[in-house]
Amino acid sequence: MEFIGKIIGVFLGWKVGGFFGAIAGLILGSIADKKLYELGSVSSSFFKKKTTRQDLFMQTSFAVLGHLSKSKGRVTEEDIQLANQLMIQLKLDDAGRKLAQDAFRRGKESDFPIRQVIREFRIGCGQRADLLRMFLQVQVQAAFADSELHENEKEVLYVIAEELGLSRMQFEQMIAMEMAARAFTQGGFYQKYQQGAYQGGYQYQQQNSGGYQHASGPTLNDAYKVLGVTESDEQSTVKRAYRRLMNEHHPDKLVAKGLPPEMMEMAKEKTQQIQAAYDLICKAKGWK
């Protein structure tokens, strides 16, 4: 029951301090509900019977990463290094690293039940749309880690998106947004932009193999794609899109909903991309 903390908090607060006590109880109860949700147990037939939402997020992420690596034909040394680098970046302890390694190994298996795993993950996350979207973005970012999205990887990502409730059009939009967003982290762009030292352009090129590979620095068109807007949209529309995306990717809010704290840096990077894209549009349009 998601609201048990609020109910108890309001009841006890009212008994102790009347109206203002109830308000205080509601606030404390809300905090308790978030913590209970974050640490609450969920069932997973693939990993183990009971686990926390945060461990489920972590294990599912690495299992899918293993599956994505295998989808290209074979798992390369580069794929394994990427997984290890991600574990280091997330600062996993020994127990967390073992969970991640086991999940990655199981994800590489030919009979990995991708749809079943994602369905259980979706249920375990309580159908939280922003958390599910963040999960998919983690996988998309991992697929682009070698600066190329293989067609087989794209099909696996679409299976995940489909199980998470996204349409093909929504999925294609997310891929386009991610390709554009990567322009804002390549070569330390965000830091350069903050210092006013950025010059140049950026575009993605489609390869003959059916995959995608980036070229060099971000364009205004990339910025529009990151926010999911068009050049003709009014300032109010662009601002609404910017605020919505910043709210969806707020690291603290995502952690409260079940994102492992170790993945906060990924969420922060996403907000930096969104901020840089919005700033670029405002500068080009002369908006304050």
From Swiss-Prot:
Segments forming domain J: 222-288
Membrane spanning residue stretches: 7-30
Domain of life, per lineage: Bacteria
Gene3D superfamilies: DnaJ domain (1.10.287.110), TerB-like (1.10.3680.10)
CDD domains: DnaJ, terB_like_DjlA
Record localization: Cell inner membrane
Any one of the GO CC terms: plasma membrane
Gene Ontology MF terms in the entry: protein-folding chaperone binding
Topology of this chain in the membrane: Single-pass type III membrane protein
UniProtKB keywords: Cell inner membrane, Cell membrane, Chaperone, Membrane, Transmembrane, Transmembrane helix
Residues on Periplasmic side: 1-6
Subunit architecture: Homodimer.
Protein name: Co-chaperone protein DjlA
Protein's organism: Haemophilus influenzae (strain ATCC 51907 / DSM 11121 / KW20 / Rd)
